[in-house]
Regions:
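Short coil/turn connectors at secondary-structure junctions
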Residues: 33, 53-54, 85-87
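Acidic/polar loop patches that form or flank catalytic/metal-binding clefts of enzymes
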Residues: 31-40, 65-67, 126-129
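A conserved active-site cap/scaffold subdomain adjacent to cofactor or substrate pockets
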Residues: 31, 62, 68, 76, ...
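Glycine-rich loop(s) and the adjacent beta-strand/alpha-helix scaffold that form part
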Residues: 1-41, 45
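N-terminal leader/propeptide and maturation segments of large enzyme subunits in energy/redox metabolism
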Residues: 91, 99-141
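A glycine-rich dinucleotide-binding beta-alpha-beta segment and adjacent secondary-structure elements
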Residues: 127-179
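Phosphate/diphosphate-binding loops
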Residues: 39-40, 47, 51-73
């Protein structure tokens, strides 16, 4: 995994047998087989249930949304693993967060405003606030022009405490396996 699929190797929960060291692959290569597309795999980011967290927003290290939060777990996992350098956070307000601290999604920042948690996470100055402002402006009108989140989960983020939940592949519950 480390050799052929290093991005999946970074995921916190590789699926498979710990004694599986690729012996079958190595035997095939030894007799002349070609090892093609060995980097392919499946990373899973199971952020729901509970469904109320889908009213939050998922952002990257720049404090920007990059996907609809209601995306299938595998689509979200793929986007974080392969397109966001393995880093993402779920931003929630008083109504959209988890009701308890789950081992797989630990809150890594909490505050009375979006700017407070953005500073705790080291996001570029004003970036997360701008993302939330844009999202809220459209959510109030029942629209998500960027990612078309369904109206079921679309509502403005408003009301402290605001929290950021860690979705980074190395730290969150992030199962992964190769094909």
């Amino acid at each position: 995994l480390k050799l052929y699929a290093p991005k999946l190797y970074e995921c916190s929960v590789p699926c498979g047998n710990v004694d599986d060291q690729g012996d079958g692959i190595n035997m095939g290569i030894a007799v002349g087989a070609a090892a093609l597309r060995m980097h392919e795999g499946f990373a899973i980011a199971p952020i729901y249930p509970p469904e109320n967290v889908l009213s939050g927003i998922v952002v990257n290290a720049s404090g920007q949304r990059f996907i609809s939060e209601e995306s299938y777990h595998g689509v979200l996992g793929d986007a974080i693993t392969y397109h966001q350098k393995g880093q993402a956070w779920l931003i929630t307000d008083q109504r959209s967060g988890y009701n308890f601290h789950q081992d797989n999604f630990l809150p890594v920042a909490e505050g009375s405003s979006i700017d407070v948690i953005a500073a705790q996470l080291g996001f570029p100055l004003g970036a997360l606030q701008q993302t939330v402002n844009y999202y809220n402006q459209h959510a109030i009108n029942g629209d998500d022009p960027m990612f078309r989140k369904s109206k079921t989960y679309l509502r403005p983020l408003q009301g402290a405490p605001y929290k950021a939940w860690d979705l980074t592949v190395a730290d969150a519950f992030f199962p992964a396996h190769t094909f």
